[in-house]
């Protein structure tokens, strides 16, 4: 599809940008493009550049098999230089010789308030007429693994290196024994009045506790596919770009993805909520029980004894699947070297990360 044939640059406004991409939000009247974003590549050195076609193939052929229900739908679209040149990129330089862009859904479409909880974590919630129907966490899980030896995990060590204040440790969300602590840390920056307002309408703590205790949750899947099974793929063993295997490029990509975790009130009249893909994403909450439950292969809308339970839908979308260039190996080596003195240091302002042996004797 050639985007210039169905829309003009004036229909798109700057939305956000990352290290490698820039997003534009559609503001025109074409129903097909409503609630969509256009993702284009930012200017990069040629040796580190991954083309949009290569990226599209990587997502469709390598990643979707691993996460069939979590990866945001994308569509390849043809660009022309005239269209790209006329976009208001707010001073950001685009890769003008790139012939393709990606169309993707705008998960944040709607009237959402945003609260920044930390550098890599944002909270969005709709606040229409004092009735909160949905909450979205935007989060980067980063490196997920079983820590056996270090005082600080890789993510917490890097944050200390960068002088980023502590928020939460992603490893805490991997284990039943530490999920509560991880969620307490995750929610701590939310202003108390807003947290209370959300909890009154959407039992955030209870629902996220159920979600992270589910062995199929996205953190567990990311941990599974981030695992290095070949010692040659360990960063410390790299000596040149040719040492970077396809598997390591995939692993490093998965260590830098972003997630949208959306929690919303279940609506039996919403065809998306009742779709086959979402049947297993419905969670029941009963105020008379200490914990909620996850619907297990149950048809939505049946008149059973639990019909009075309040139902919620939890969906997770993975975005930012940017295939990592082999040329980044020097950067990876440098960072790993810089972290060596932090892994087993002691910071009075930073609690030690959980070690696997502490909970699995």
UniProtKB/Swiss-Prot annotation:
GO CC annotation, single: nucleus
Primary localization: nucleus
Compartmental location: Nucleus
Alphabetical list of Gene3D superfamilies matching this protein: Inositol-pentakisphosphate 2-kinase, N-lobe
Residue ranges of the region described as Disordered: 285-304
Enzyme class at the top of the EC tree: transferase
EC number: 2.7.1.158
Gene Ontology molecular function, alphabetical: ATP binding; inositol-1,3,4,5,6-pentakisphosphate 2-kinase activity
Motif (EXKPK motif): 138-142
Pfam families recorded: Ins_P5_2-kin (PF06090)
UniProtKB keywords: ATP-binding, Kinase, Nucleotide-binding, Nucleus, Transferase
Alphabetical list of InterPro entries matching this protein: Ins_P5_2-kin, IP5_2-K_N_lobe
Catalytically driven reaction(s): 1D-myo-inositol 1,3,4,5,6-pentakisphosphate + ATP = 1D-myo-inositol hexakisphosphate + ADP + H(+)
UniProt-listed GO biological process terms: inositol phosphate biosynthetic process; positive regulation of autophagy
Domain notes from UniProt: The EXKPK motif is conserved in inositol-pentakisphosphate 2-kinases of both family 1 and 2.
Record family assignment: Belongs to the IPK1 type 1 family.
Function: Has kinase activity and phosphorylates inositol-1,3,4,5,6-pentakisphosphate (Ins(1,3,4,5,6)P5) to produce 1,2,3,4,5,6-hexakisphosphate (InsP6), also known as phytate.
The name this protein goes by in its record: Inositol-pentakisphosphate 2-kinase
């Amino acid at each position: 599809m050639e985007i210039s044939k169905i829309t003009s640059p004036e229909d798109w406004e700057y939305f956000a940008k990352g290290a490698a991409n820039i997003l534009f939000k559609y503001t025109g009247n074409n129903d097909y493009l409503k609630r969509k974003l256009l993702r284009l590549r930012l200017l990069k050195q040629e040796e580190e550049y991954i083309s949009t076609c290569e990226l599209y193939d990587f997502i469709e052929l390598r990643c979707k098999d691993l996460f069939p229900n979590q990866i945001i739908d994308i569509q390849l679209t043809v660009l022309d230089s005239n269209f790209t040149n006329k976009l208001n990129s707010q001073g950001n330089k685009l890769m003008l010789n790139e012939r393709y862009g990606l169309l993707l859904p705008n998960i944040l479409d709607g009237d959402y308030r945003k609260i920044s909880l930390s550098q890599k974590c944002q909270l969005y919630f709709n606040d229409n007429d004092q009735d909160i129907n949905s909450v979205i966490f935007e989060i980067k899980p980063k490196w997920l693994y079983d820590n056996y030896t270090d005082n600080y995990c890789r993510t917490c060590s890097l944050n200390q290196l960068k002088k980023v204040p502590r928020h939460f440790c992603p490893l805490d969300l991997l284990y039943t024994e530490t999920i509560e602590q991880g969620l307490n840390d995750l929610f701590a920056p939310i202003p108390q009045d807003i947290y209370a307002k959300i909890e009154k309408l959407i039992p955030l703590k209870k629902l996220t506790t159920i979600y992270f205790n589910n062995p199929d949750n996205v953190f567990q899947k990311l941990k599974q596919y981030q695992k290095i099974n070949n010692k040659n793929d360990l960063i410390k063993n790299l000596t040149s770009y040719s040492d970077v295997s396809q598997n390591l490029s995939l692993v490093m990509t998965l260590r830098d993805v972003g997630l949208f975790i959306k929690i919303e009130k279940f609506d039996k009249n919403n065809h998306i909520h009742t779709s086959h893909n979402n049947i297993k994403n419905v969670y029941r909450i009963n105020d008379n029980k200490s914990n909620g439950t996850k619907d297990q292969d149950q048809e939505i809308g049946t008149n059973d004894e639990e019909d009075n339970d309040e139902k919620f839908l939890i969906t997770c979308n993975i975005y930012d699947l940017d295939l990592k260039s082999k040329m980044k190996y020097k950067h990876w080596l440098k960072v790993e070297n810089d972290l060596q003195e932090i892994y087993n240091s002691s910071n009075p302002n930073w609690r030690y990360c959980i070690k696997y042996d502490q909970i699995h004797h």
